Amino acid sequence: MFLYDARKGGVRGIRHKAGQSLIKFKNAGFTYGGRYILSEMNLHLQAGSFHFLTGPSGSGKTTFLNLCYQALMPTTGTVQIFEQDVRVMTRDDIAKMRRRIGVVHQNCQFLDHLSVRDNLMLPLVVSGRKDEIDQSSLDDLLSWVGLTDRGNALPPELSGGERQRAALARAVIMSPDLILADEPTGNVDWEMGQRLMALLVELNKMGKTILVATHDLNLIRKVKSELSARTLRISNTKLQLPGANL
């Protein structure tokens, strides 16, 4: 399988020890236009965990995820990613860190003139690692997300659900340790949302760490019936732990 490394006898991309904190927030905050969007955030995101991030629209869920891979810098406090303080990371540190994190956006973007297959390969091509996955492994990846017959299609030809599955495939092709998903089921129907969430659950069972921002409480309940997942909630700029009882 594309995520299994036969040479090492394990899942590709697992570079951490069980229980290690991959993301640490210590009194972290973020301001925009002089106003706090997030404040006094404290969190240890442990390796192998599955977390949901909830909160009203505009509460700062996307901002929180952006802080988790240094797309934004904290205004106050500290954020550590893979035990490195984001404030002192070099460009090389940032590049290495981002190779270990897969991101799935609600409105995923692709290069429309390239096939799905070529779009999936872009992260590896850009990072000089295209030889790390062969065509058979790429076929396995397409099959895993249910896009076996869509590899040669162009992005505009895909349905909303197919685009989201392609986005997930692109996020995991680098074999990341941590996967951040921002409303991955927001633009799809209930059935497709369940399929996407089932893939994230499968990744978690492989040892991947998952953080999903969502407002879909029914999907949260379904996942919680299958595995031990925690729910975090942002309210009035603060992060509530361990989260609301849903």
State the predicted function of each range.
Residues Y69:
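Helix-to-loop junction immediately C-terminal to a conserved catalytic motif
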Residues G77-D85, M97:
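Conserved ABC transporter NBD signature motif
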Residues L114-L122:
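Short coil-to-helix segment of the ABC ATPase nucleotide-binding domain corresponding to the Q-loop/switch region
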Residues A153-P156, M174, M206:
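Conserved signature/switch motifs of ABC ATPase nucleotide-binding domains
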Residues L154-L158, E162-Q164:
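Conserved ABC ATPase signature
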Residues L168:
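Hydrophobic anchor residue at the start of the ABC signature
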Residues I179-D182:
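Catalytic Walker B motif of ABC-type/P-loop ATPase nucleotide-binding domains
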